């Protein structure tokens, strides 16, 4: 029987009472499925439920076959050896003991049928570009991106029937991403992948769109899905226009009917006052008129209510594509203004900047390089979080740095309170007015940061830094699109389009870098920082 995932009447609620799923029914069959949806829709939660990391409040999750799960945030014990991280340490030790002449039965039981486990492990590492990593090395010696691939290699060695990947390309350089793409393409079983990586999602066979606790299916990859979505959106917007026209018509008809009824009432009162007919006749006529008027009014009110309901349904069918709108005139930097200077800079972990490097005016700089090259270390040094090993670094304008870990937020404070910390001179009304531009309106601004989804948390952190006082004229972002859905990436792009200061972005997401108007490309490679041409970027990232 083909391996599959069957979810029946699934309900799940977080400890604080926030519902995620109520009666969800869905099945994933053979092939590669891209699970998409806005941040906070429950994509990662669904993967964790399927993987058995979370238990449903109600309903069932059944998986035919073994499950392999790559979480969004990969953490490995740095003291482990690579073979331990791969799950083959015991078998490898038994093999070596047998090769050394120890024929104890326990060693043969440990090896089982996996006599080629070491060769398979080395092959799996090689396929993912980790052929240089020895099995006896410790995990602490590999970079963050390599640890993701190491965890994936461990899963591939297990040969699970079902593979669940949650944002697998986060923290991977372009070279590592291509290795992962190849592994995804060659996967023979059931795969469900959550990602904002368009190139990865274009490798899937179908898209499952999770929205409002329900899943809609689209055949084909992400590009095909986007085309289908555009057609749906246009149709939904047409239905809104039709429903609005009908609603206006019903309002006019109700108003006209009310005017006519008022005229009749005045005429009837006039007849009564003038007593032109017997009282009993006029009374009967008045009661009949009132009954008719009541029925007429109720009919029009019902029609109006039905039109209102159709309009609400039509509006609900249109996707909410809110965009961040930022107007920050104090972030503007004059073209000739010196923003940042580096002189013979030596970083704590070995990288260096030979000679001098200068940023002027509202330049937009991309910092690229392989995993472990030192990009984050360089940004932290510029931000003043790390002391330089040698040389000098100086920011000549107010600077703000948004790290990957988003620890600029205090999880126990609300969104509004976090922003107020960075703008102590701003009134509460001013803070909330500014937050509305970052889509935190009303009660959303009163959410605690710890309860936010990945995209919301990033948006709140970005708001805190961009709304800070003094206004940042140099903004540095470290892998900003990690953990963001497509809508959030579009929102970030819009926000950065409105930003008038200088920008330095470390990212492996080349389409995103191109969309924010990068003007200079800096490559950190083999311990040296150098400027490269845009044409060379795709070969160097």
Which residues are covered by each model-predicted region?
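ABC-family P-loop ATPase nucleotide-binding domains
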Residues: 76-144, 404-474, 479
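Hydrophobic anchor residue at the start of the ABC signature
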Residues: 152, 180, 462
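Coupling and communication elements adjacent to P-loop NTPase active sites across diverse families
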Residues: 1-13, 91-148, 228-349, 541
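Conserved beta-strand-loop-alpha-helix hinge in the C-terminal portion
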Residues: 79-80, 84, 213-238, 524-541
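Conserved beta-strand
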Residues: 7-10, 17-31, 59, 342-361, ...
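Conserved H-loop
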Residues: 197-203, 224, 407-408, 510-515
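ABC ATPase nucleotide-binding domain signature region
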Residues: 30-33, 45-106, 361-429, 508, ...
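Catalytic Walker B motif of ABC-type/P-loop ATPase nucleotide-binding domains
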Residues: 163-167, 172, 402, 474-479, ...
